Amino acid sequence: MLRQGIAAQKKSFATLAAEQLLPKKYGGRYTVTLIPGDGVGKEVTDSVVKIFENENIPIDWETIDISGLENTENVQRAVESLKRNKVGLKGIWHTPADQTGHGSLNVALRKQLDIFANVALFKSIPGVKTRLNNIDMVIIRENTEGEYSGLEHESVPGVVESLKIMTRAKSERIARFAFDFALKNNRKSVCAVHKANIMKLGDGLFRNTVNEIGANEYPELDVKNIIVDNASMQAVAKPHQFDVLVTPNLYGSILGNIGSALIGGPGLVPGANFGREYAVFEPGSRHVGLDIKGQNVANPTAMILSSTLMLRHLGLNAYADRISKATYDVISEGKSTTRDIGGSASTSEFTNAVIEKLAKL
């Protein structure tokens, strides 16, 4: 079903939602859940809202303003909103390492809505100086099990057991998602990241499942495997060898941070999360930015580009193309870039530069 009716452009992002599961328009407009999150979330989502208003994009926002520091019961407000609207744009909720009493709201949201696939796009951007150029890889991460299952307990004082859950059903689901993504986006290979040399049952199940799905259902694509520690080294040394990486939960988080460093930082990485019924778009590297909150210096590029992925998901491709081009043009010219990529512009100045560029397109 996912292969039907959706055309892909070469090396561009193609949605994987079935058309019948997309939200309905009311009065010619979509309603989208907006979750600013913590840290710089409000600043960068404000950039998107301003750009969308300037472009008269037919989207209304339902804002759910809660913090990751709040009780997990509050995540229900976001869940209920997303169930109504089916699509969301989200900042990152902060989960302190020493937090006790409740788990991550980010994880809770993904589990409750079964948003099982995280997609992060790592592509070199002209105008951003980095050690390596022409990087173009995708990390597809299973979002709902693995080390993030949240099953921990102290069996006796001083002894903690953390359970890693891996299932064939969810491994098959993320494998098919990755292969479908590769086909729709004219990618050539899918590489399973694992640690099956040590975790022979859990990661062995994941690796073998990806291999079987690829060999039996997607013979036109190359299927590869790599151990996660080697993948980390290869990503730093020779990232051009990678096309689409499919990973269990934890490995995708680690490799995603490596990928963001390769292309210039977390402020440049767009991302999306998909389930069967719902889609939530957020920066791909999931950095909160608490240290620069309220300073008007955050790079909104990742959030802006994530919003263009959302527009394509909704079939609003012309708006997405305009905003993407304007954003890339501003970065390429280098006159109004933020300090994380060598400039001195503020968040609002970068946003205004994108709007000015849009007026000239």
Curated annotation (Swiss-Prot):
Catalytic activity: D-threo-isocitrate + NAD(+) = 2-oxoglutarate + CO2 + NADH
Gene3D superfamilies given in the database record: Isopropylmalate Dehydrogenase
Primary role: Performs an essential role in the oxidative function of the citric acid cycle.
Main subcellular localisation: mitochondrion
UniProt superkingdom: Eukaryota
Cofactor note text: Binds 1 Mg(2+) or Mn(2+) ion per subunit.
Binding site for Mg(2+): 229
EC number: 1.1.1.41
Needed cofactors: Mg(2+); Mn(2+)
Keyword annotations from UniProtKB, A to Z: Magnesium, Manganese, Metal-binding, Mitochondrion, NAD, Oxidoreductase, Transit peptide, Tricarboxylic acid cycle
Species in which this protein is naturally found: Kluyveromyces lactis (strain ATCC 8585 / CBS 2359 / DSM 70799 / NBRC 1267 / NRRL Y-1140 / WM37) (Yeast)
Name of the protein in question: Isocitrate dehydrogenase [NAD] subunit 1, mitochondrial
Subcellular localization(s) per the UniProt record: Mitochondrion
Residues reported in the UniProt entry to bind substrate: 110, 141, 229
Transit peptide, residue positions per record: 1-12
InterPro entries per the UniProt record, alphabetical: IsoCit/isopropylmalate_DH_CS, Isocitrate_DH_NAD, IsoPropMal-DH-like_dom
Database matches in SUPFAM superfamilies: Isocitrate/Isopropylmalate dehydrogenase-like
Family statement drawn from the similarity comment of this UniProt entry: Belongs to the isocitrate and isopropylmalate dehydrogenases family.
NCBIfam families on file: mito_nad_idh
GO molecular function: isocitrate dehydrogenase (NAD+) activity; magnesium ion binding; NAD binding
A cellular-component GO term for this protein: mitochondrion
